[in-house]
């Protein structure tokens, strides 16, 4: 049997499917998620239910978002899960997570995410951060390093700034390729993201912050002065107390927020 086949399902490359099969890793992730009935529990990409089954076993209801129609059908007929699941068949990148919000409950979101959509999905989920208690995701290790990076490091970039603006970021564990079927070509890791209830550095326009950081990191080897010359003058940098000769990866999250707020105030 091909190593792409697990529990009778052939992994689809276009969906980025790698199914988690290591019981020890699964148990550690479920422990980190800490499922309960006090939150709206949401899984993205349940796949063959490696996390779905142990999470659902201890709660009354689990909401899942799955793109693959074949996997949706498996879940709908699952002997144990079918009565506990609320299944949404569709693309998580386009899914409106606000529809899952309950007045008295925050969401806990988790999943073994397809690596080919992990970065855009992070940006999509940040839009709903005010309704999320925490998130636990299996990601490519490189993406977890980018999420948790410090200024001045190679991994520090646009994703770092936006993730750390919205959330506390904590790596949980590293997961080698042998824990999956089929094994991915890269190492994986689990990350915990806890959205701030009160942002340490409030931003007046988050879209502006996102656009400014994208512009700043478009050319990493060039200086802030060069990359942001359409937005900020030397006088602006001086007023902010930011050295315009620095490169984008040398600037802290709070400094990016200060720059975005300054541009907003100039409008």
Curated annotation (Swiss-Prot):
Gene: rsmA
Organism: Shewanella halifaxensis (strain HAW-EB4)
GO MF annotations in UniProt: 16S rRNA (adenine(1518)-N(6)/adenine(1519)-N(6))-dimethyltransferase activity; RNA binding
GO cellular component: cytosol
Name of the protein in its database record: Ribosomal RNA small subunit methyltransferase A
Protein keywords: Cytoplasm, Methyltransferase, RNA-binding, rRNA processing, S-adenosyl-L-methionine, Transferase
Function: Specifically dimethylates two adjacent adenosines (A1518 and A1519) in the loop of a conserved hairpin near the 3'-end of 16S rRNA in the 30S particle. May play a critical role in biogenesis of 30S subunits.
Positions with a binding annotation for S-adenosyl-L-methionine: 18, 20, 45, 66, 91, 112
SUPFAM superfamilies: S-adenosyl-L-methionine-dependent methyltransferases (SSF53335)
A matching Pfam family: RrnaAD
């Amino acid at each position: 049997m091909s190593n792409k086949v697990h529990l009778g399902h052939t992994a689809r490359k276009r969906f980025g499917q790698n199914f988690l099969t290591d019981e020890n890793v699964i148990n550690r992730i479920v422990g980190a998620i800490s499922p309960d009935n006090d939150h709206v529990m949401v899984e993205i990409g349940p796949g063959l239910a490696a996390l779905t089954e142990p999470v659902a076993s201890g709660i009354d209801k689990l909401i899942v978002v799955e793109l693959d129609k074949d996997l949706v059908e498996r879940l709908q007929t699952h002997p144990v899960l079918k009565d506990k699941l609320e299944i949404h068949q569709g693309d998580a990148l386009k899914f409106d997570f606000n529809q899952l919000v309950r007045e008295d409950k925050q969401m806990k979101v988790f999943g073994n995410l397809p690596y080919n959509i992990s970065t855009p999905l992070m940006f999509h989920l940040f839009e709903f951060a005010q309704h999320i208690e925490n998130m636990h995701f299996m990601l490519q290790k490189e993406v977890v390093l980018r999420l948790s990076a410090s200024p001045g490091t190679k991994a520090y970039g646009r994703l770092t700034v936006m993730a750390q603006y919205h959330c506390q970021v904590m790596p949980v564990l590293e997961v080698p390729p042998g824990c999956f079927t089929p094994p991915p070509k890269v190492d994986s890791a689990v990350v915990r993201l806890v959205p701030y209830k009160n942002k340490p550095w409030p931003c007046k326009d988050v879209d502006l912050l996102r656009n400014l950081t994208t512009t700043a990191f478009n050319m990493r080897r060039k200086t802030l002065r060069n990359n942001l010359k359409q937005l900020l003058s030397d006088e602006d940098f001086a007023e902010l107390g930011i050295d315009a000769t620095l490169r984008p990866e040398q600037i802290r999250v709070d400094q990016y927020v200060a720059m975005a707020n300054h541009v907003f105030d100039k409008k």
